[in-house]
From Swiss-Prot:
Involved in the biosynthesis of isopentenyl diphosphate (IPP) and dimethylallyl diphosphate (DMAPP), two major building blocks of isoprenoid compounds. Catalyzes the conversion of 4-diphosphocytidyl-2-C-methyl-D-erythritol 2-phosphate (CDP-ME2P) to 2-C-methyl-D-erythritol 2,4-cyclodiphosphate (ME-CPP) with a corresponding release of cytidine 5-monophosphate (CMP). This is 2-C-methyl-D-erythritol 2,4-cyclodiphosphate synthase. GO terms for biological process: isopentenyl diphosphate biosynthetic process, methylerythritol 4-phosphate pathway; terpenoid biosynthetic process. Homotrimer. It comes from Clostridium tetani (strain Massachusetts / E88). Its cofactor is a divalent metal cation.
Length: 158
């Protein structure tokens, strides 16, 4: 068994869709980034790669590569799954947290879990997503951006 952690943060800006966990969430701002800036998928991807000691998403999908401009982070997760499977690893479970003052995430979490379980080809019961605020403190509390954290447990085929 191997464990990895992931963390990501993106700034909220006007003129972009808000995509979290592959789900388009109605909100007046979206996250700024080279890809679709899906903060949750990025944290999950980093936790998976970290558990396999394979670096991070920046190494595999650099923001200097135009192939990933506007790229779906769900597709990044599909690629990450392929990468770890080639090394003999499979995902046991994922636990993650979205940190955002607004919008409220509860209504979207089940669809996020479905989206992520589908692209990673794991049971929805093996993915947990929580949401919290920072009680109007700091970067997320002042609604300047959104953060996500993730932990992943991998096993290796013998």
């Amino acid at each position: 068994m191997r464990v990895g952690i992931g963390y990501d943060v993106h700034k909220l800006v006007d003129g972009r869709d808000l995509i979290i966990g592959g789900e388009k969430i109605p909100f007046e701002k979206g996250l700024l980034g080279h890809s679709d800036a899906d903060v949750l998928c990025h944290a999950i991807g980093d936790s998976i790669l970290g558990a396999a000691a394979l670096g991070d998403i920046g190494r595999h999908f650099p923001d200097t590569d135009n192939r990933y401009k506007g790229y779906s982070s769900l597709k990044l997760l599909e690629e990450i799954k392929r990468i770890i499977n080639e090394k003999g690893y499979y995902i046991t479970n994922i636990d993650s947290t979205i940190i955002a003052q607004k919008p409220k995430m509860l209504a979207y979490i089940n669809n996020m879990r479905k989206n992520i379980s589908k692209v990673l080809d794991i049971s929805i019961e093996d993915i947990n997503i929580k949401a919290t605020t920072e009680e109007e403190l700091g970067f997320t509390g002042k609604q300047l951006g959104i953060k996500a954290q993730s932990i992943c447990l991998l096993n290796k085929n013998i």
